[in-house]
Amino acid sequence: MSIFALQKIEAIKGKQEFDKLVVDGKCPFDEFENSLESQYKSELAGIYHYMQDVADLKSVPYAKFHFYDEGKNGVREFEFKSKHLRVYGITKSNGKIIITGGTKTKQGTEQNEFRKLKNLYLASLMRKK
């Protein structure tokens, strides 16, 4: 059974909180970020800019940020996008939880991994109740 925690994303400060999911002491989003080739660093900076806009409750183009679903149990899936990068997460009552990231070329596989982590995390919350 995995142990989950949330860690605040210090670079994002706004009306909404932005956290990243930590699984068994490792953060999938940090691992994604650290594995990026240098040519994609500017795209990731752009995604951080859109995260800040969302945290500040500003309007963001649908092509850069959108929800995937209507939400179950008050939790909705979302995606931040750039030309080559994707960042996946879910909503929480006072903000967003970033779960993982990926590239456009592998997005099918990475969406499956995102949903697997999301479901495990949500199941862990239900066990705590």
What are these regions (language model features)?
Residues 52-79:
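A short, surface-exposed loop/turn module that caps and links secondary-structure elements
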Residues 18-21, 76-80:
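Generic recognition of long tandem-repeat/solenoid scaffolds
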Residues 17, 28, 74, 104-105:
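Polar low-complexity intrinsically disordered regions enriched in Ser/Thr and small residues
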Residues 1-46, 129:
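Arg/Lys-rich, positively charged N-terminal/basic patches that mediate binding to nucleic acids
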Residues 1-12, 78-86, 90-129:
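Enriched for short, Lys/Arg-rich terminal
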Residues 38, 53-57, 123, 127:
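A structural signal for alpha-helix termini and helix-coil/disorder junctions
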